[in-house]
């Protein structure tokens, strides 16, 4: 029947193989029949509509490449199917080859990077070994080049500053307690006649510059007070309280030492208002090395000896005046002439240490 239909006019009027309808099983190759149904395949000798059991896996491959011989039209479709499959296989193979090339390139790129890192590590080790052999050298702190000695000095100053900050609360606490005891001591001393003049005259250094006239004026000294300004390093104030006397009008005479921001220590004193005819003669000698009166200390602001008097009163007489009051006999003092100032120089400049 297949041969008879091939020669009829209907067969000639049928569309070409590429335009065959999807439902026409006579024009579909074996591979398409398998994909559509999956239950069987067309045998080359079978007629239209006849199905046979599906062959095995090995036979399926041969069947996929063997076209149907019906009407001689399916032979042209089989090569097209095989060609599409071959192109897909070649495209997959080319993609795999490209991936392999990329992986190989990445491997070759990693190897030089590892070699560079190893080379850098080796250079760093060589530099460290060279520095260790060179020994101590200058420290580079930013833009400054400081040797180890200066670096240690900076650290010591930082520790000192930290100690000052830690000491300040303790100083304030015990300073209040100390001022309380000093107030009680002053109350008792002002009721002892001639206490301070006796202490001044018994002091081995201060007695050398007290004249008989100074002794008479110091007999009216009621109380002496030494107070530090805020902090021991900023300055100190000496306050002398007197009873009414025939020599001057002042009830209080103050001598103050203050450390300015520039680091210079300046002194300020109360001007003494002398009664008429009681003003002492010239107080300073020509060579500016000796003085005639203890009260000249209040008007002198440039002589080093004046700072020495302040140092002695602050650090020696004021902390414990009782020890000089109880000495007994007063030492011999210079009379009728110019009394020289003590030659001992304090270990540290005045105004920069605590009493």
Swiss-Prot record:
Basic and acidic residues compositional bias, start-end: 93-128
Signal peptide: none
One GO MF term: histone binding
Classification via Pfam families: NAP
Assigned GO CC terms: chromatin; nucleus
Coiled-coil region(s): none
Region (Disordered): 1-131
A GO biological-process term: nucleosome assembly
InterPro entries: NAP-like_sf, NAP_family
Family named by the database record: Belongs to the nucleosome assembly protein (NAP) family.
Protein name: Putative testis-specific Y-encoded-like protein 3
Gene: TSPY26P
């Amino acid at each position: 029947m297949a041969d008879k239909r091939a020669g009829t006019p209907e067969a000639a009027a049928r569309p070409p193989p590429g335009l065959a309808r999807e439902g026409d099983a006579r024009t579909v190759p074996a591979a398409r029949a398998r994909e559509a149904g999956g239950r069987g395949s067309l045998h080359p000798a079978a007629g239209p509509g006849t199905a046979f059991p599906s062959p095995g896996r090995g036979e399926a491959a041969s069947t996929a490449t063997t076209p149907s011989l019906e009407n001689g039209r399916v032979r042209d479709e089989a090569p097209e199917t095989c060609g599409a499959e071959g192109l897909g296989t070649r495209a997959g193979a080319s993609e795999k080859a490209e991936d392999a090339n990329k992986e190989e390139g990445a491997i070759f790129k990693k190897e030089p990077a590892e070699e560079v890192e190893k080379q850098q590590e080796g250079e760093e080790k060589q530099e460290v070994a060279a520095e260790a052999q060179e020994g101590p050298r200058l420290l580079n702190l930013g833009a400054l080049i400081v040797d180890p000695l200066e670096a240690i000095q900076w650290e010591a100053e930082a520790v000192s500053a930290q100690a000052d900050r830690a000491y300040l609360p303790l100083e304030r606490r015990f300073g209040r307690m100390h001022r309380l005891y000093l107030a009680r001591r002053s109350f008792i001393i002002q009721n002892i006649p001639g206490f301070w003049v006796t202490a001044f005259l018994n002091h081995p250094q201060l007695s050398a510059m007290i004249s008989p006239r100074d002794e008479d004026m110091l007999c009216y000294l009621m109380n002496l007070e030494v107070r530090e300004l805020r902090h021991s390093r900023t300055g100190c104030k000496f306050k002398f309280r007197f009873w009414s006397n025939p020599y001057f009008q002042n009830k209080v005479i103050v001598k103050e030492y203050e450390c300015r921001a520039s680091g210079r220590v300046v002194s300020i004193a109360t001007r003494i208002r002398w009664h008429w005819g009681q003003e002492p003669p010239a107080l300073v000698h020509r060579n500016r090395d000796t003085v005639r009166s203890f009260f000249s200390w209040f008007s002198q602001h440039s002589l080093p000896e004046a700072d020495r008097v302040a140092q002695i009163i602050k650090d020696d007489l004021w902390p414990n005046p009782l020890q000089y009051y109880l000495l007994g006999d007063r030492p011999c003092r210079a009379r009728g002439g110019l009394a020289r100032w003590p030659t001992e120089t304090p270990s540290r400049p005045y105004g920069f240490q605590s009493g």
